[in-house]
């Protein structure tokens, strides 16, 4: 698996409620396979602490990349949850890449919405 933003192959896996998410150790981005992100955003936020992180370097956030699963070019699109966040989506496998810090922004928006 290669990071779509910084091209490293150094990932750590975090398993939350049976869902495994890969985090790039260099740029702190997160890879979610199909439907994993929406499932996790509906979980109790206390379980999601291992996925929270600092914002990545801006140079990585603007970069277009390829899907780490199938090398399809990722499509950048505004998140329906928080339009201030641009997510990178693979149209082939439906996976989603979030740059460092974007998971936090989405989670905070979900928490505000659910109050």
Where are these regions (language model features)?
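Cys/His-rich microdomains that often coordinate metals
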Residues: 9-11, 31, 71-74, 97
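Short, structured motif recognition centered on aromatic/hydrophobic residues
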Residues: 30-32, 37, 96-98, 103
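Short, solvent-exposed interaction modules
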Residues: 52-96
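Short, intrinsically disordered terminal segments enriched in charged and Pro/Gly residues
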Residues: 36-58, 107-115
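Short cysteine-rich clusters marking metal-coordination/redox-active sites
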Residues: 3-6, 24-27, 67-70, 90
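Terminal recognition/anchoring or ligand-binding modules at protein termini
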Residues: 92, 99, 103-114
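Short, recurring structural edge motifs at helix starts
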Residues: 9-13, 17-25, 74-79, 85-87
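Residues immediately within or flanking Cys/His clusters that coordinate Zn2+
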Residues: 1, 21, 29, 64, ...
């Amino acid at each position: 698996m290669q990071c779509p933003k910084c091209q490293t192959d150094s990932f750590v896996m975090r398993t939350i409620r049976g869902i495994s998410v890969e985090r790039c150790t260099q740029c702190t981005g997160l890879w979610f396979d199909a439907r994993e992100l929406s499932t996790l955003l509906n979980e109790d936020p206390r379980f999601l602490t291992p996925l929270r992180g600092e914002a990545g370097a801006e140079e990585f956030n603007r970069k277009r990349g390829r899907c780490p699963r199938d090398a399809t070019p990722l499509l950048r699109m505004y998140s329906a949850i928080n339009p201030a966040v641009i997510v990178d989506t693979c149209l082939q496998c439906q996976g989603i890449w979030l740059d460092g810090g974007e998971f936090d922004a989405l989670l905070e928006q979900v928490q505000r919405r659910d109050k």
